From Swiss-Prot:
<keyword id="KW-0813">Transport</keyword>
<keyword id="KW-0345">HDL</keyword>
<feature type="region of interest" description="10 X approximate tandem repeats">
    <location>
        <begin position="67"/>
        <end position="265"/>
    </location>
</feature>
<dbReference type="GO" id="GO:0034364">
    <property type="term" value="C:high-density lipoprotein particle"/>
</dbReference>
<feature type="repeat" description="10">
    <location>
        <begin position="242"/>
        <end position="265"/>
    </location>
</feature>
<dbReference type="GO" id="GO:0033700">
    <property type="term" value="P:phospholipid efflux"/>
</dbReference>
<dbReference type="GO" id="GO:0050821">
    <property type="term" value="P:protein stabilization"/>
</dbReference>
<dbReference type="GO" id="GO:0055090">
    <property type="term" value="P:acylglycerol homeostasis"/>
</dbReference>
<dbReference type="GO" id="GO:0034362">
    <property type="term" value="C:low-density lipoprotein particle"/>
</dbReference>
<dbReference type="GO" id="GO:0042803">
    <property type="term" value="F:protein homodimerization activity"/>
</dbReference>
<keyword id="KW-0558">Oxidation</keyword>
<comment type="function">
    <text>Participates in the reverse transport of cholesterol from tissues to the liver for excretion by promoting cholesterol efflux from tissues and by acting as a cofactor for the lecithin cholesterol acyltransferase (LCAT). As part of the SPAP complex, activates spermatozoa motility.</text>
</comment>
<keyword id="KW-0597">Phosphoprotein</keyword>
<feature type="repeat" description="8">
    <location>
        <begin position="210"/>
        <end position="230"/>
    </location>
</feature>
<keyword id="KW-0449">Lipoprotein</keyword>
<keyword id="KW-0564">Palmitate</keyword>
<feature type="modified residue" description="Methionine sulfoxide">
    <location>
        <position position="109"/>
    </location>
</feature>
C-alpha cells in the first residue's frame, strides 16, 4: 500500500508541476530569480551562522575565551547588508543589459516553445481529464468500504485492507497506462523542440559573427559590472578590517590569559 500511495503522490506532484510549467502566465525575470535565490541563501547562512556563534559563546569554552564573536558577527552581517544594497542596482543593470542584448535569440526560442506547447496542450488536457475520471471511479469504489469500516468492528480492518489492495493496484496500473500513453504522445514533440533548439544554436555557431558578438557583449557587461562593483567591494574590505582586528585582539588576549594561568600553576 505504501508503494501505491507513493506512486499516486508522484503522479499528483508531477502533474501539478507540468501544468505550472506549461500554463505559467507571469514568469519571473532572470534578475528576480537570482535576487530571490541569493536573498534566501544569504539569509539562511546569516541565521544559521548566528545560531552557531550564539551556541559557542554560551559554551564553557566560549565564556572562558570571551571573544565577543556575536558582536563581531552582527557588525559583519551589517557590513554585508550595506554592500548588498550598493551592488543591487549595479547587478540589476548588468542583467537588464544582458537580457536586452539576447532579446532576439530568446524571442525565437520562446516562439518555438509556444508552438510546441500549443501542439501538446490537447494531450495534457486529455490526460488531466482521464486522471480526474479515474479518481472519481476510485472514490466511488472505495466509498462503500469506508462505510463498512465505520459500521464494522476492528477485526474487519484486515478484511477491508484486503479489499482495498486490489482496487489500489488497479488504479495504479490504469494510471501507469495513462502516463505511458501521454509519454508516447509527447515524445515526438519533445524531439521536435530539442531539434529546434539545436538548430538555433547551430545557426549561431555557423554565423560565427553573431556568436562572437554575444560573447563580446557579455564580456563587456561583465567588465562594466566589475568596475562598478569596485567601490562597494572596497567598502566591504574597509568594513571587515575593524571586525578582523577586533577578533585578532580578542584571540590574542585569550591566549595571553591562558598562558598566564598555566604559568601560575
Amino acid at each position: 500500500m505504501k508503494a501505491v500511495v507513493l506512486t499516486l503522490a508522484v503522479l499528483f506532484l508531477t502533474g501539478s508541476q507540468a501544468r505550472h510549467f506549461w500554463q505559467q502566465d507571469d514568469p519571473q525575470s532572470s534578475w528576480d530569480r537570482v535576487k530571490d535565490f541569493a536573498t534566501v541563501y544569504v539569509d539562511a547562512i546569516k541565521d544559521s551562522g548566528r545560531d552557531y556563534v550564539t551556541q559557542f559563546e554560551a559554551s564553557a569554552l566560549g565564556k572562558q575565551l570571551n571573544l565577543k564573536l556575536l558582536d563581531n558577527w552582527d557588525s559583519l552581517t551589517s557590513t554585508f547588508a550595506k554592500v548588498r544594497e550598493q551592488l543591487g542596482p549595479v547587478t540589476r543593470e548588468f542583467w537588464d543589459n544582458l537580457e536586452k542584448e539576447t532579446e532576439s535569440l530568446r524571442q525565437e526560442m520562446n516562439k518555438d516553445l509556444q508552438e510546441v506547447k500549443q501542439k501538446v496542450q490537447p494531450y495534457l488536457d486529455e490526460f488531466q481529464k482521464k486522471w480526474q475520471e479515474e479518481l472519481q471511479i476510485y472514490r466511488q469504489k472505495v466509498a462503500p468500504l469506508g462505510e463498512e469500516l465505520r459500521e464494522g468492528a476492528r477485526q474487519k480492518v484486515q478484511e477491508l485492507q484486503d479489499k482495498l489492495t486490489p482496487l489500489a493496484e488497479e488504479m495504479r496500473d490504469r494510471a501507469r497506462a495513462h502516463v505511458e500513453t501521454l509519454r508516447q504522445q509527447l515524445a515526438p514533440y519533445s524531439d521536435e523542440l530539442r531539434q529546434r533548439m539545436a538548430a538555433r544554436f547551430e545557426m549561431l555557431k555557423e554565423g560565427g559573427g553573431s556568436l562572437v558578438q554575444y560573447h563580446a557583449k557579455a564580456s563587456e557587461q561583465l567588465k562594466a559590472l566589475g568596475e562598478k562593483a569596485k567601490p562597494a567591494l572596497e567598502d566591504l574590505r574597509q568594513g571587515l578590517l575593524p571586525v578582523l582586528e577586533n577578533l585578532k585582539v580578542s584571540i590574542l588576549a585569550a591566549i595571553d590569559e591562558a598562558s598566564k594561568k598555566l604559568n601560575a600553576q
